[in-house]
């Protein structure tokens, strides 16, 4: 005999498993091994992270802004000391998603970016010079600090456009 509460639990668990299956299928479809796979992931990132940056800018508190600045400082420290900075960059992007106030956006980005060390592999293909990397987040963080959601979205999308341009150059060099 199954209670109403038990039925509800089983239905929620079934729905959760279906969502995880669909998310895993998306990840498999957008293989990290191909140019088109990386471009697909970049397109999804632009949608999710553009929204996240806008929402973050519109709701951020000074204490949270300082956390973003600290993550940016960690990122700059890493690349200035010869490291790729992938982990620090990922932390910054996920913090912006967290500060958007949308747990769903954060979960989707974590799923897309952390599966099979995807972010480090993405970063390896997309990043070309330390100078570009050092300046890449500055205008985004300034828009967030100003509380300008529309500008923050635009800056995030512009940032990811630069990543896309670097991806194209990376794959052109491999052909």
Give a label for each model feature.
Residues 44-60, 88-127:
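Hydrophobic, amphipathic alpha-helical faces that serve as interaction scaffolds
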Residues 64-78:
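Amphipathic alpha-helical segments enriched in hydrophobic/aromatic residues interleaved with Lys/Arg
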Residues 1-47:
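Short linear motifs at protein or domain termini
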Residues 111-175:
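C-terminal all-alpha effector/ligand-binding and dimerization domain
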Residues 65, 85, 106, 152-153:
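Solenoid-repeat scaffolds in large eukaryotic assemblies
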């Amino acid at each position: 005999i199954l209670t109403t509460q038990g039925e509800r639990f089983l239905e929620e668990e079934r729905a959760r498993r279906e969502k995880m299956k669909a998310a895993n299928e998306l990840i498999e479809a957008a293989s990290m091994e191909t140019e088109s796979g990386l471009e697909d992931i970049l397109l999804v990132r632009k949608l999710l992270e553009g929204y996240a940056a806008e929402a973050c800018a519109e709701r951020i508190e000074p204490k949270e802004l300082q956390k973003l600045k600290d993550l940016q400082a960690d990122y700059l420290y890493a690349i200035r000391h010869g490291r790729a900075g992938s982990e620090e960059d990922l932390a910054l992007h996920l913090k912006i998603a967290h500060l958007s106030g949308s747990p769903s956006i954060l979960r989707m980005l974590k799923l897309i970016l952390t599966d099979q060390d995807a972010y480090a592999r993405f970063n390896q293909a997309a990043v070309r010079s330390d100078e570009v990397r050092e300046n890449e987040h500055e205008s985004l963080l300034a828009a967030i600090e100003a509380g300008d959601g529309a500008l923050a979205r635009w800056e995030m999308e512009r940032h990811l456009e630069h990543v896309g341009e670097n991806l194209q150059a990376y794959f052109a060099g491999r052909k």
